[in-house]
Each structure stands twice: as C-alpha cells, then as structure tokens.
Amino acid sequence: MLELFDVSYEELQTTRSEELYKLRKKTFSDRLGWEVICSQGMESDEFDGPGTRYILGICEGQLVCSVRFTSLDRPNMITHTFQHCFSDVTLPAYGTESSRFFVDKARARALLGEHYPISQVLFLAMVNWAQNNAYGNIYTIVSRAMLKILTRSGWQIKVIKEAFLTEKERIYLLTLPAGQDDKQQLGGDVVSRTGCPPVAVTTWPLTLPV
C-alpha cells in the first residue's frame, strides 16, 4: 500500500525528520543543484519549524515523496526568501504555501514500479489536504521544469507572476486550485492509470493499493 498523510513539525521531529531531510538534500542539493543549506547530509531551512505541516508518502515503511505547507500568515518563501521577486503580489490573509515538493525517483521505481504516477498521486494528495483544511487553493513558487510537470498533469494551475533569478533562470509564482473539479480530474487520472477503486482517491488521508 501507498499511504499519504500529513504530520506537524513536532510530529516529524519524533518520527521521520532525519529521513526526510536526507532525501531533500539528495533531491535539491545533489540532483537539482539548488543553493540550499545542508549540514550532516541533511537539508532544512528556517521554514521547518512549529506551525509547518508536511505530507509524507510512505510505501513499505519507506518515505518516497513529500511536500511542505506553510501558512501565509507566517514567514514563507514568497514573502521572505523571494520577497524581492514578488513584493508587488497581494496575498490573502488566509492561505497556504507549498514548498520542497519532491519524489525520490529511485525509491519510487523500486517500490512502485517504473510507471506508477507518483507525482500525480502527490498532486491529488495536495488537493485533498487543502480541501480538508478549507483552503480553496495553494500558492507555490516553482522552476520552469516544475511548471512543465504541473502543466502536463492537467491540473488547472494559474501563473500569477514570472520572475528572473538570473539572466537565464526563471521562477514562477502559481496558484494551485483545490476545488472539486481539480479533485475529480486528478483523481480520475490516478484511477485510470493505477486501477485503484474510485472511492480510494476521494479521502484524506490517502491509502492506495500498488
């Protein structure tokens, strides 16, 4: 089974923080070459703290994917890290930002198979989580490569603003809608590609057969 559920920062510290931070270092520093702060083989930053929540995707006891959520009324990447890019964007008082989205490709292939739509499942989990927490959409900053992945998913994302980190490197502030249409579209795709029961994609947390 593939289980996706959310935990608080405090819960993470007593369970899988070391595993998560090591996989984030492997993804964002080693594979993608991002300029992130790493220590003792792990990556974490100032937004990993009380009030932050994390979706964890677990298969056979191993973490295969994750994404982090920070409330917009707290320091976040939009208003702090990339404030110089998006200071002219007005954000709602009540909302959430997602960041540190990743899939460990090697683990996913080994545990789920070459063609399992793990990114699509994690997108669906984000929608179900948002609905469960009364968020109509999710704000996020992505690279051009991630923008292409999201666009191909069929999720009806919206680009709020494009910004240039360097002369060649662009980033995008997006809204990811979390309505019933989005749930049905992403969930229907997961059902068609995995053969799981339709009811399995409607819940939060998610438990999917593999």
Curated annotation (Swiss-Prot):
Superkingdom per UniProt: Bacteria
Coiled coil regions, renumbered to chain: none
Keyword flag Transferase: yes
Enzyme superclass (EC): transferase
Keywords for this protein: Autoinducer synthesis, Quorum sensing, S-adenosyl-L-methionine, Transferase, Virulence
Enzyme Commission number(s) of this protein: 2.3.1.184
Gene3D superfamilies for this protein: 3.40.630.30
Physiological role: Required for the synthesis of OHHL (N-(3-oxohexanoyl)-L-homoserine lactone), an autoinducer molecule which binds to EsaR. OHHL is necessary for biosynthesis of EPS virulence factor (extracellular heteropolysaccharide) which plays a role in the development of Stewart's wilt on sweet corn.
Name of this chain's protein: Acyl-homoserine-lactone synthase
Gene source species: Pantoea stewartii subsp. stewartii
